[in-house]
């Protein structure tokens, strides 16, 4: 599922260095990294191995450099895992999805492999990242950069006219991306009537896959970006940028691939699935109260996936609810198996079996899943070193996810405190969305923030709350109920 993104934008009046303009937040983010012991520089032996393998990679012989792949990523990204090419095929479609072949550079048991198993995944803060692999690989030799020949696992998928896959193959090949786009580029091109069929077909296939997701009861979470800026007085402002439809279309290609990978693994009875249970009843109740607090109507019979699809991304209150919906997607984990099929195979939000195989530059488990699937397609045994690693991956990935989530939460807390620090003493209208032994959680709508409140005792109640603390260094926001409590 999607992660929260925080974008620190430049001061409109100064156009200076964002790191200088946002010094208070940068210091808070540095403190988060130190407190959580976020990995820093790579050890010398890892950098030495990375330098050595760049010119000695185990490259595939198959050549698909004439296929017009393109990449779609956030602006400025250099760790490009995925490139796609979509074509018409009869009444359906042919989707080729190239995934960076990290295994061509990473020797099993080597220094890079050992360090990657310690890190688990790339960790993102608003002002920087702690990468899974050294930049010589992750942002250069293994990255699917434009006009560069790179090794990749190519997923060659035939889809029918409804967008359902009818055949899937995976093979290693050399590829070349011809275009590097961001989501805004794609959206603008499609809206003005692009002549690039790859983009018009991405919209077509993406919309068909969204319809299939809706039919099977799935739920996607297109997280809006938190945008942090400074006003003329130097106060922090917090807003949400709505995701554009192109982000959904692009995500559907990744979901298509992950679902195909899971089916492949289950048929071969070896692999590792990304699984997730249905959200707990109490989590749903709390989210319903959050929706009511933001003025969003949620009929009792409507599933949460339907609600998320129905929200208006141009409405700030709806965006705030989407941003808060991450609570519905917790509890995901990894289920390895080798011989037989596990009892739990479903990812509740996908509403189907699912596997992570599309982000090997940024997530450890994907490297192993890709090798499993390519071995299955070649009708070859999965390598022993991969089989031996599968049972170890859930613990590694769980630890790295806990760290990633803690970092995300701490950075978000710092940003929200910064946005409110000049408003301490103000009174806000709020709704109590949960009650704890230490008080409760209240939702205010402008800015859309969920925070603790002293004296909140009735879930679902409306109240007037005073902001009593907004401390960036402590990453703390706190309210207290001052009156006007009415039950719902």
Report residues per predicted region.
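Electropositive polyanion-binding surfaces
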Residues: 2-38, 45-461, 470-477, 486-487
């Amino acid at each position: 599922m999607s992660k929260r993104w925080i974008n620190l934008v430049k001061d409109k009046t100064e156009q200076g260095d964002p790191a200088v303009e946002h010094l208070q937040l940068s210091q808070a983010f540095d403190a988060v990294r130190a407190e959580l012991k976020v990995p820093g520089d790579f050890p010398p032996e890892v950098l030495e191995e990375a330098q050595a393998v760049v010119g000695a990679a185990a490259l595939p012989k198959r050549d698909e450099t004439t296929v017009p792949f393109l990449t779609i990523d956030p602006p400025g990204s250099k760790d490009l895992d995925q490139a796609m090419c979509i074509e018409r095929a009869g009444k359906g479609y042919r989707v080729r999805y190239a995934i960076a072949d990290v295994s061509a550079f990473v020797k099993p048991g080597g220094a890079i492999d050992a360090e990657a198993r310690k890190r688990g995944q790339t960790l993102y803060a608003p002002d920087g990242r702690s990468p899974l692999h050294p930049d010589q690989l992750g942002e250069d030799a293994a990255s699917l950069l434009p006009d560069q020949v790179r090794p990749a696992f190519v997923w060659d998928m035939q889809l029918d006219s409804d967008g359902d896959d009818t055949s899937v193959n995976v093979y290693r090949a050399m590829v070349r991306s011809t275009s590097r786009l961001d989501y805004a580029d794609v959206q603008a091109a499609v809206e003005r009537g692009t002549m690039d069929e790859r983009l018009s077909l991405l919209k077509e296939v993406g919309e068909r896959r969204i319809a299939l997701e809706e039919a099977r009861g799935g739920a996607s979470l297109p997280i809006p970006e938190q945008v942090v800026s400074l006003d003329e007085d130097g106060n922090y402002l917090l807003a949400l940028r709505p995701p554009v439809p192109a982000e959904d279309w692009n995500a559907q290609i990744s979901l298509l691939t992950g679902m195909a990978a899971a089916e492949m693994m289950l048929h071969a009875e070896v692999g590792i699935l990304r699984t997730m249970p249905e959200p707990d009843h109490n989590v749903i109740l709390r989210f319903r109260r959050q929706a009511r607090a933001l003025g969003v109507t949620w009929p009792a019979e409507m599933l949460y996936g339907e609600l998320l699809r129905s929200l208006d991304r141009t409405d700030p209150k709806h965006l705030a609810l989407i941003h808060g919906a991450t609570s519905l997607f917790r509890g995901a984990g990894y289920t390895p198996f080798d011989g037989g099929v596990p009892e739990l195979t479903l990812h509740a939000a996908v509403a189907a079996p699912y596997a992570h195989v599309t982000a090997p530059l940024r997530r450890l488990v994907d490297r192993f899943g890709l090798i499993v699937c390519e071995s299955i397609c070649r009708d070859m045994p999965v390598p022993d070193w991969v089989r031996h690693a599968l049972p170890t991956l859930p613990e590694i990935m769980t630890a790295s996810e806990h760290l990633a989530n803690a970092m995300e939460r701490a950075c978000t807390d710092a940003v929200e405190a910064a946005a409110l620090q000049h408003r301490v003493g103000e009174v806000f209208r709020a709704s109590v969305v949960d009650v704890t032994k230490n008080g409760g959680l209240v939702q205010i709508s402008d800015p859309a923030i969920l925070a603790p409140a002293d004296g909140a005792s009735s879930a679902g109640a409306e109240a007037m709350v005073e902001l009593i603390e907004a401390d960036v260094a402590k990453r703390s926001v706190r309210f207290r109920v001052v009156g006007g409590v009415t039950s719902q």
